[in-house]
């Protein structure tokens, strides 16, 4: 019987992918392998690598050893079988969808997703022959009714953007699997420290690693994690890209070649090969530095956020706080169930008044930076209706509960008293 013990999250985030020192140099820190290409031992070795018969480095567009450590570590933290790092979160989402969606296919997506992903689905993919249905993820009957014969995926986020709505992943997974389609979950705002969607039935998890994983607003990156549980071959006609012969690999079937890791293997071998949204070794290394302190930072983010929510709830100039920790929030009970340690450091509130009052508050808010990123160690603020979600129509904004009075906060890890004082001061400018 094995005596090997299962390591816990805080240990995994430091050691996976480099359990021993670097074999070439004995360096304890993960090296930056700043190279474009790799030497093959002989011609047969090169042919086996290109033919997917031997796993390993081929060319820098596809793999890199620094990148590999990062991929393995995120996959382990999420409880997946394999990971793929790419140049940005947007690339991760795009590749995950393109991997199974073809001309004539259909996707069902939640209505509270990130504005960029919403545009990808409703505008960009739709020009490529992919139809869509946008649904309220709380309305399970609506979700199920939206699934068609040509539906290839159900897509949602752990926490909605920007209002921090909570997704019932277990229920969506049940619906998706009843119709033999995968559930793809963006866990950027949840982080694997607070929730692991694969354990709740998700099949594929995507991240903008730019956010909590990196944590410092310094590097772009995205990650796709393969849960390894969806049976692509049992649904071969629905998922030919994974379960039928691949023309550019002489008829190889990814579900056979890569087994449980078929999903990310095909993205790497086909989509990344052909379109090249490659993460740089340096960015992968920077994101690894962030990953090593993920649990510590997220704990502080959550502590501060809950105190800010409490403060805003009592502020007479605030009309509503959109956070599931608030007892009156429709997702409050689900939030307590899925996030016993809290969560949701990115959320919105509606100021009394409208755009004028929201802008007045934002423009006088110290410490908080006015920018489009979130999940930085530094606190951030923005007006979603005129920035991150400005591509949406007035009707779409209202459907997502984003109003002229809505302000989005991303709470950092500063001293909470300093943050409360800054908020209090900014409210004095709102008449």
Stretches with model-predicted labels:
Residues 225, 348-350, 410-412:
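Short hydrophobic/aromatic beta-strand micro-patches
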Residues 159, 188-190, 326, 352, ...:
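Active-site beta-loop-alpha junctions enriched in small/polar residues
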Residues 154, 222-224, 321, 347, ...:
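Well-ordered beta-strand positions enriched in small/hydrophobic/aromatic, beta-favoring residues
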Residues 2-64, 72-73:
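N-terminal "arm"/small-domain region of PLP-dependent enzymes with the aminotransferase-like
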Residues 2-5, 17-21, 84-315:
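Conserved PLP-enzyme active-site core in the AAT-like
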Residues 2, 122-123, 131, 149, ...:
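PLP-dependent enzyme catalytic core of the Aspartate aminotransferase-like
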Residues 42-91, 116-124:
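Conserved N-terminal alpha-helix of the aminotransferase class I/II PLP-enzyme fold
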Residues 275-278, 282-284, 289, 293, ...:
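Conserved small-domain helix->loop->beta segment predominantly found in fold-type I
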